[in-house]
Amino acid sequence: MEDYLKQFVEETSFYNRLVLGTFMPESWWGPLPHMLQGWLRNYIGGVLLYFISGFLWCFYIYHLKRNVYIPKDAIPSNKAMLLQISVAMKAMPWYCALPSLSEYMIENGWTKCFARISDVGWLSYVIYAAIYLVIVEFGIYWMHMELHDIKPLYKYLHATHHIYNKQNTLSPFAGLAFHPLDGILQAVPHVVALLLVPMHFSTHIALIFLEALWTANIHDCIHGKVFPVMGAGYHTIHHRTYRHNYGHYTIWMDWMFGTLRDPVEEDAKKM
């Protein structure tokens, strides 16, 4: 078993060398404990992903496609976006503690993770990944709902994110603009799922970082109309009503539990 777990350590060490070695001499990060190296790598990767994706996204929809996707008077101000960036950057060091913790758990054999797809085969890999995503979808839905329904959680945690409740205050940069504990709680299902279902290690890490892109997507206020995806059209309604569309990747949970509100139907009512 110890030899098998070494594969995870070797993989995270490779990621550390790849990221940290690109931005600083090894004498700076080499002496750090392995877990702290992982946190620093996750932090650098998270910051880069947030800014690169956010700036490219905003440049495209607010400038290159000005008045195509977003009406001119609905484009958020620079002040609003800078506030979102400030909130996200204060939370980022704390966000990165979660993937660092999950890596530690995996490296120590506390989870059901496997290192190589060949360990289980492609069919099992796809089935396990699908079950993992269902658990994540279910967990995030209920965590998100409780952050609204439990008044102290909303007041002291989730309200930080819901100051952005109109189209002209929402932007891709709002995607990670949470109280640190709020952001961590909503990502916890990714770690809980590792205890319940076998999951490919690299896919797990990739899905956690995909959250940064996904949350940017659902805060751009552009309804993609891709069924059954819980896109920005649905999430914008959530920011307006606070009582609908708690789901994450799909509309499945909201449909099952009666909290779904369709943006197409909403637009039809306004006409």
UniProtKB/Swiss-Prot annotation:
A motif (Histidine box-1) lies at residues 144-148. Residues 130-259 form the Fatty acid hydroxylase domain. A motif (Histidine box-3) lies at residues 235-239. It catalyses: a Delta(7)-sterol + 2 Fe(II)-[cytochrome b5] + O2 + 2 H(+) = a Delta(5),Delta(7)-sterol + 2 Fe(III)-[cytochrome b5] + 2 H2O. GO terms for biological process: sterol biosynthetic process. It is a multi-pass membrane protein. Its cofactor is Fe cation. Signal peptide: none annotated. It is an enzyme of class 1 (oxidoreductase). InterPro entries: Fatty_acid_hydroxylase (IPR006694), Sterol_Desaturase_Related (IPR050307). GO terms for molecular function: C-5 sterol desaturase activity; delta7-sterol 5(6)-desaturase activity; iron ion binding. It is found in: Endoplasmic reticulum membrane. Involved in the biosynthesis of sitosterol and campesterol. The histidine box domains may contain the active site and/or be involved in metal ion binding. Belongs to the sterol desaturase family. This is Delta(7)-sterol-C5(6)-desaturase. It comes from Nicotiana tabacum (Common tobacco).
